[in-house]
Amino acid sequence: WIMGHMVNANYQIDEFVNLGANSIETDVSFDSSANPEYTYHGVPCDCRRWCKKWEYFNNFLKALRKATTPGDSKYHEKLVLVVFDLKTGSLYDNQAYDAGKKLAKNLLQHYWNNGNNGGRAYIVLSIPNLAHYKLITGFKETLKTEGHPELMEKVGYDFSGNDDIGDVANAYKKAGVTGHVWQSDGITNCLLRGLDRVRKAVANRDSSNGYINKVYYWTVDKRQSTRDALDAGVDGIMTNYPDVIADVLNESAYKAKFRIASYDDNPWETFKN
């Protein structure tokens, strides 16, 4: 999965997919009542990026729905996964459940079209704080209450705080999550970060009793760091330059081993060689 980083304005969906991304990451900011309000990152953000592009969350969802609904004039067949980077740092811990509930209602109405031929992409809810695990509970219970528990088949999870892998496993236990787990590791492109924790996550993914299904690394903009991440065995790379990742995947060393994921590749299944 080539994951376009910080796609927060509607027009950037086309821009990143046209550069080679089959997945995008979008920042979601919340108001003081835990309503998802804007797709917005803000300052500081990655080097060589403009941090202030934004859209109202529901308007972004509508554009995303069009981009992932077969038959729509804006449809992109290869856009198959969306990571919502949930900026819950502005919320109190006790608002996490409400944030999940409100997020689910927004997605149900504006992305899934109330279960009636909505967008088809798989969705990852990426949460920066382990203490906010109840966001998952709120999301799940709301879809059930609203009569669409089947949509949870399209939803996965990520805790993005680079926490100890054992602590992450524990948070999932509390949230009642037993699958659909993506594990992120990384740092802004302005700084360097080694691959030690990525290797631990990959080892967990590949062990018989691990909780992780997929591992992705962020934010990778250079050819050499792309090669290093692929060599470490990641499933996804988040980038500001999808074309760079696509180029490396075309190199002879990687062409035979990796391919770009399509809609038929289940993002919740651990890949077995």
From Swiss-Prot:
Disulfide bonds join 45-51, 47-190. Its EC number is 4.6.1.-. GO terms for molecular function: lyase activity; metal ion binding; phosphoric diester hydrolase activity; toxin activity. Expressed by the venom gland. Pfam families: GDPD_2. Its cofactor is Mg(2+). InterPro entries: PLC-like_Pdiesterase_TIM-brl. Keywords: Cytolysis, Dermonecrotic toxin, Disulfide bond, Glycoprotein, Hemolysis, Lipid degradation, Lipid metabolism, Lyase, Magnesium, Metal-binding, Secreted, Toxin. Glycans are attached at residue 250. One of its GO terms (cellular component) is extracellular region. It is found in: Secreted. The active site is at residues 5, 41. One of its GO terms (biological process) is lipid catabolic process. It is an enzyme of class 4 (lyase). Mg(2+) binds at residues 25, 27, 85. CDD domains: GDPD_like_SMaseD_PLD. It catalyses: an N-(acyl)-sphingosylphosphocholine = an N-(acyl)-sphingosyl-1,3-cyclic phosphate + choline; an N-(acyl)-sphingosylphosphoethanolamine = an N-(acyl)-sphingosyl-1,3-cyclic phosphate + ethanolamine; a 1-acyl-sn-glycero-3-phosphocholine = a 1-acyl-sn-glycero-2,3-cyclic phosphate + choline; a 1-acyl-sn-glycero-3-phosphoethanolamine = a 1-acyl-sn-glycero-2,3-cyclic phosphate + ethanolamine. Binds 1 Mg(2+) ion per subunit. Belongs to the arthropod phospholipase D family. Class II subfamily. Dermonecrotic toxins cleave the phosphodiester linkage between the phosphate and headgroup of certain phospholipids (sphingolipid and lysolipid substrates), forming an alcohol (often choline) and a cyclic phosphate. This toxin acts on sphingomyelin (SM). It may also act on ceramide phosphoethanolamine (CPE), lysophosphatidylcholine (LPC) and lysophosphatidylethanolamine (LPE), but not on lysophosphatidylserine (LPS), and lysophosphatidylglycerol (LPG). It acts by transphosphatidylation, releasing exclusively cyclic phosphate products as second products. This is Dermonecrotic toxin LapSicTox-alphaIB2. It comes from Loxosceles apachea (Apache recluse spider).
